[in-house]
Each structure stands twice: as C-alpha cells, then as structure tokens.
C-alpha cells in the first residue's frame, strides 16, 4: 500500500481527492494539510467522507514540505503557492501531482504574463499531465502539472482534428462552467443571487486558460494556431460544456469525423465518443469521463464539436489520480471507474 499526502485539503479539489481516493485499493491517505484548520478532525470539515477509508482517524496538519515522507503528494494549493512547495518535494524524490497552474508552462514568461506572478521554482522535468496526449512522458516523470479544467475539455474536443491537420488555423472555444470552478471561497460573482437563473461570460478574451489550450494544440499541430476562448458561468454546481468551432480544410462527412475520433481515442477508457445524441453535464457528473459529440458540419464547412467533463474530476482531482495511477504503474482506472450521477 502506497502512502498519499494532500497539501491543501480544504478546497474543492482536496475534497474530491478524498472522495475518490476512498475507493482506491492501492493507496492510503496519511497526511492532509491545512494551516487554518490544523488540529481539527478531517471528517468534521469534510463530513461527506465520514466512515470512509481511514478518514475518521485523520486530523488536518500544518506540516512543512520537507517533513512530508509519503510516496505521492497531491498539491492542491492556489496558483503561486505550489512553486514554494513542489521544488522541495521534487528534491526529495517524491512523486508530485500539482493541481495549480504553476508548472503547466515550459515558457516561464508566458506563465508570468498570464498569471501576474513571478515564478520562483522552475522544474525542467515537469510534465503536462493530460494522459491522452502525454502518457509516455507522464510514466517517466515524478512531477506532473495537472491540466486546468477548461483546457482539458477544450483540448480533448479538438485534438483529433488538429493532430490530423483537418481544420484551419483558427479555432474558437465557447465553454460554460459550474460555479465550483471558481473555488471554495465565496465572492460576489458566485453569490447565489447573482448566479441563480443567470448566465454570463467573464474574462472574454483574457482568461489564463487561453494560452494553455493554445500551447497544447500547437504542440499537436506542430505550428502556430489562433485559438480563441471565452468562458461563461452557469447556475449549476459542477461541469463544463465546451462547444468548439473551426473550418475544415477538406470536404469530409460527419461519419468520417466520428471515425477519426474513434481511432484517435480507441485505447482511451475515459473518452466516450457520441455517434448519436449530445454530451451532457449530468452524464459526466462525479466521473472522470470526457464525453465528446456533436460532429456537425454546416454548409460553409464549419465543424462543431461538443465536450462535457466534470470540472472537479476529469478537470482536476480525477485526472490527478489518473496521473498518479500512470506514474505508479497502477491500473489507470483504479478509483475512477464510476458512472455519471444522472439524474
């Protein structure tokens, strides 16, 4: 049994890690850190995991990175905080999956420009942890930068077309997310009275996930692409629905496109291709699946692809566990093989 520590255990991603890891047969959580809640019973703060695994016996700890001695560490801290923690764990040879944006960019200037932070802990060997694109690199790395939630749904929705050079260099993503994507801290934006019965775009051209989507698709295309991304906030708790648009370079049918997607993702358990019907948020809620469908082409050659993920699972904690499974040589589905909560 391998041991796991969670640094930053009071947020939504920490909560989801606990829920999902309670079903994992190969690991045991031994440390959950929180400076604010240190000394308090874990299950008093997270009653939803009471009586699961060994959680009734755990208390939050305020433990320094250099004092952590477990096989795997999930770093579920805010952007900017991880870079002060991960290098220490890296030097100790501990397997680290970082859920912040601190290690998603090889280009530090790009990170600093979009996040408005000075990066202080560069690790050249860190790998972008999107298994469907980088599985072999993930296997060989001990430091994984878990992808952002919006980029996960966006990249996976268009990767087969981009990799096969079937679309023009302009791609537009329109994504709609539940409010849990904004984190556990309350704000005016996520206040019930402002979100309920409402929908609205935000950071319409300047969301920090834009360059993350762009760099990964450019990696696949091996050329520059013009990627546009606009997020919207939905009055729901979980899920991201992404609608991707581009123009085909050649005259192919929706059936051809579906075959291309099925071939590209043929070995990917967590990718479900919809030949008919449409992906939905309820279909993926609570799961590590990314559902992809739509595949419609209009009279101008515009192709539209739709993807759905749970932003807290495939968009965060579930994908982090998938990455851990790959690093440790576990069954990739371990702890993650559940269906959607529908209705």
UniProtKB/Swiss-Prot annotation:
| GO biological-process terms attached to the record | L-arginine biosynthetic process
Write out the catalytic residues in the record: 149
Q: What class of enzyme is it?
A: oxidoreductase
Mind telling me which GO cellular component terms the entry cites? cytoplasm
| GO function term, MF aspect, one | N-acetyl-gamma-glutamyl-phosphate reductase activity
- Which pathway does this chain act in? Amino-acid biosynthesis; L-arginine biosynthesis; N(2)-acetyl-L-ornithine from L-glutamate: step 3/4
Read off the CDD domains from this record. AGPR_1_C (cd23934), AGPR_1_N (cd17895)
Task: Report the superkingdom from the record.
Answer: Archaea
Q: Where in the cell is it found?
A: Cytoplasm
This enzyme's EC code(s): 1.2.1.38
State the UniProt keywords alphabetically: Amino-acid biosynthesis, Arginine biosynthesis, Cytoplasm, NADP, Oxidoreductase
- Give yes or no: UniProt keyword Oxidoreductase: yes
* Catalytic function, reaction form: N-acetyl-L-glutamate 5-semialdehyde + phosphate + NADP(+) = N-acetyl-L-glutamyl 5-phosphate + NADPH + H(+)
One Pfam family in the UniProt entry: Semialdhyde_dh
Does this UniProt record's set of keywords contain Zinc? no
- HAMAP family given in the database record: ArgC_type1
Family statement: Belongs to the NAGSA dehydrogenase family. Type 1 subfamily.
Function description = Catalyzes the NADPH-dependent reduction of N-acetyl-5-glutamyl phosphate to yield N-acetyl-L-glutamate 5-semialdehyde.
Q: What is the recorded name of this protein?
A: N-acetyl-gamma-glutamyl-phosphate reductase
Taxonomic source organism: Methanococcus maripaludis (strain DSM 14266 / JCM 13030 / NBRC 101832 / S2 / LL)
């Amino acid at each position: 049994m391998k041991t796991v520590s969670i640094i930053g255990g009071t947020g939504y991603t920490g909560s989801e890690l606990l829920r999902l890891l309670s079903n994992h047969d190969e690991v045991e959580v031994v440390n959950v850190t929180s400076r604010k809640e240190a000394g308090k019973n874990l299950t008093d703060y997270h009653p939803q995991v009471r009586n699961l695994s060994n959680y009734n016996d755990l208390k939050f700890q305020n433990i320094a990175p250099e004092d952590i001695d477990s096989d795997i560490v999930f770093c579920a801290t805010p952007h900017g905080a991880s870079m002060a923690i991960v290098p220490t764990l890296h030097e100790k040879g501990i397997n680290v999956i970082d859920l912040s944006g601190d290690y998603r960019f090889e280009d530090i200037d790009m990170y600093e420009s979009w996040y408005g932070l000075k990066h202080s802990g560069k690790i050249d060997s860190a790998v972008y942890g999107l298994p469907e694109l980088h599985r072999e690199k993930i296997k060989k790395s001990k430091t994984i930068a878990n992808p952002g939630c919006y980029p996960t749904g966006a990249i996976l929705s268009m990767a087969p077309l981009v990799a096969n050079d079937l679309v023009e260099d302009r791609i537009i993503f329109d994504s709609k997310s539940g409010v849990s994507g904004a984190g556990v801290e309350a704000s005016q934006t996520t206040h019930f009275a402002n979100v309920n019965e409402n929908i609205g775009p935000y950071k319409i051209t300047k969301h920090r996930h834009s360059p993350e989507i762009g760099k990964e698709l450019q990696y696949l295309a091996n050329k520059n692409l013009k990627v546009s991304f606009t997020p919207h906030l939905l009055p729901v708790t979980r899920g991201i629905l992404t609608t991707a648009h581009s123009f085909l370079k050649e005259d192919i049918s929706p059936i051809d496109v579906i075959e291309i997607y099925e071939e590209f993702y043929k070995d990917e358990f967590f990718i479900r291709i919809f030949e008919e019907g449409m992906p939905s948020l309820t279909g993926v809620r609570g799961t590590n699946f990314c559902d992809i469908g739509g595949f419609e082409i209009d009279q101008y050659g515009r192709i539209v692809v739709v993807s759905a993920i749970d932003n807290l699972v495939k968009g965060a904690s579930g994908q982090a566990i998938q990455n851990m499974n790959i690093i440790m040589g576990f069954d990739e589905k371990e702890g993650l093989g559940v269906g959607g909560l529908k209705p």
